[in-house]
């Protein structure tokens, strides 16, 4: 697990020390000091919206980033940096999006939006995994977000949606009624 990857590995450290691989030993020891990671476990798989809500007490009243591990983004400027810059300009929830093939829209949350500038869309609507025939666009949410903390109260009152889970897209759709989203 990711938790174990960034944790100390006493067995590995001992082996490297015994074999005299001191450069590697120093690298391994430094891994756990590179970043601070806090883990909040979702006790049962009730959807992404539920997973995010589980972090409410940790996040508090701050905007936060969500970065899903099932999408890899290869961009000249890192995706998270782009989202932060957009947040700093618009001071509201920001969704990372990408165009997908029309036949793939049923695999993603899809955005209906108005193009503003420099890859920025103002969100008009969000649909979680729409039918190919009814999708409003092929602009897909790609699993990168900056979200403002108002989402927590919304998720708390969001009924389970597709697959009986609390969907983040459903919560964002409610949030969009009271706050612009890009």
Where are the model-predicted features located?
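Short alpha-helical
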Residues: 1, 46, 146
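Glycine-rich loop at the start of a catalytic domain that most often binds anionic cofactors/ligands
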Residues: 2-10
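Solvent-exposed polar/charged
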Residues: 4, 33, 57, 174-177
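Conserved beta-loop-beta/alpha segment of the NTase-like Rossmann-fold superfamily
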Residues: 11-15, 22-113, 156
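Catalytic-core segments of class I nucleotidyltransferases/pyrophosphorylases
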Residues: 65, 85, 115-182
């Amino acid at each position: 697990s990711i938790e174990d990857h960034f944790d100390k590995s006493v067995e590995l450290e001992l082996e490297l020390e015994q074999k005299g691989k001191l450069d590697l030993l120093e690298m391994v020891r430094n891994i756990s000091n590179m970043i601070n990671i806090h883990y909040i476990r979702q006790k049962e798989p009730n959807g992404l919206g539920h997973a995010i809500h589980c972090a409410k007490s940790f996040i508090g009243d701050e905007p936060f980033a969500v970065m899903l591990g099932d999408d890899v983004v290869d961009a000249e400027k890192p995706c998270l940096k782009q989202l932060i810059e957009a947040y700093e300009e618009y001071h509201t929830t920001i969704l990372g999006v990408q165009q997908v093939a029309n036949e793939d829209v049923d695999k993603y949350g899809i955005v209906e939006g108005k193009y503003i500038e420099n890859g920025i869309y103002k969100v008009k609507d969000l649909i979680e995994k729409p039918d190919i025939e009814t999708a409003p666009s092929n602009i897909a949410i790609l699993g990168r977000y900056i979200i403002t903390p108002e989402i927590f109260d919304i998720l708390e009152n969001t009924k389970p949606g597709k697959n009986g889970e609390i969907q983040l897209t459903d919560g964002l759709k409610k949030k969009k009624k009271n706050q612009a989203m890009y």
